Amino acid sequence: MATTQQPEATEHQHFGVVEIKDLENHKFIKPVKVVTNEDDIKKFLRSGACRDLLEYIQTLSDKIKSKPNSTKTQNSNEIKNIVSMLNEISVYIDNIPPLAQPMRYGNKAYRTFYQKLLDNVEELHKHLLPQSMHSSIIELSSYLMDAMGNQTRLDYGTGHELHFVVWTYCLRRIGFLKSTDEEDIVLNVFTTYLDLVRKLQRVYGLEPAGTHGVWSLDDYQFIPFIWGASQLIGNPFDIKPASVTIEKVVDQYYKEYLYIACIKYINTVKKGPFHEHSRDLFNISGAASWQKINTGMMKKFYDDVLSKVPIIQHFLFGSLISFSV
């Protein structure tokens, strides 16, 4: 785990998301895959798209620094409507039970769920967005669909999670969400999304995409560890990094902190002692502070997600987050 000394989170420079000013004349396009090899990855890592994405994730991390999930926020109508839309998608799962089939991973009923969402995703966005923003749906729909996993491989992983973050970024770019919504993007929207995809993982037995086994942070998620560590900086409950190995602490605080909720979920779905099934997370719990973990997680995200061809070869680029090789 990298513990390179970096400025405190409050010292990060934020240039903000650049909103599209003239939506009426902006040319939205269906996002496509662009990256195919290591040379493409090197270009991507130097690109404005990568810089903007990292900046956005860091901005959200800083916005929720030292703030538990129950923090009183603005909770705008836009945020409420997004949460309502995600909850509506969750009901699809309730109405499409898994098939009786002898498979460890990948229940084929997931494909029925995916098709149901595909059939409705445009209408869901039309209901969410004002008429003036409907031209952006061609891009938004692609990101939201991929944020739910892959219907061919019946899997879900960090690349799908990343596309959900990109979906919220695009909602910022078109001006549907504002800078004043950024706390809520994590504390209300992303937490609802996590509940949704964990439900998908459990009900349909989705295979982890590109898991590293006991050396993975989590078979499915990454970003809640970045944002969750930020939440725990300076927490009033004296929850230290090593505290996540204590079951009583996890049970007491998992509803308040993303990081601890991740540990709780891992302990629920994996068998055996924590230090055996999650060695990387166990080692990270030895870090000196949550600030160091937050900084290290950002570096690890850059190295293990954004720098990997198997993940970024599936990343979709459109007009709102663009890149060409």
From Swiss-Prot:
> Looking at the record's lineage, which domain of life comes first?
Eukaryota
Molecular function, one GO term: peptidyl-prolyl cis-trans isomerase activity
User: Record's Pfam families?
Assistant: PTPA
Its BP terms in the Gene Ontology are: mitotic spindle organization
Q: Where found, per UniProt?
A: Cytoplasm
InterPro entries with a match to the protein in the record: Phstyr_phstse_ac, PTPA_C_lid, PTPA_sf
Protein family membership: Belongs to the PTPA-type PPIase family.
Provide the top EC class.
isomerase
Enzyme Commission number, as recorded = 5.2.1.8
List keywords of the entry alphabetically: Cytoplasm, Isomerase, Rotamase
Record field: catalytic activity: [protein]-peptidylproline (omega=180) = [protein]-peptidylproline (omega=0)
Q: What does this protein do?
A: PPIases accelerate the folding of proteins. It catalyzes the cis-trans isomerization of proline imidic peptide bonds in oligopeptides. Acts as a regulatory subunit for PP2A-like phosphatases modulating their activity or substrate specificity, probably by inducing a conformational change in the catalytic subunit, a direct target of the PPIase.
Protein name per Swiss-Prot or TrEMBL: Probable serine/threonine-protein phosphatase 2A activator 1
Where does it primarily localize? Answer: cytoplasm
Q: Which organism is this protein's natural source? A: Dictyostelium discoideum (Social amoeba)
Q: Which PANTHER family match?
A: SERINE/THREONINE-PROTEIN PHOSPHATASE 2A REGULATORY SUBUNIT B, SERINE_THREONINE-PROTEIN PHOSPHATASE 2A ACTIVATOR
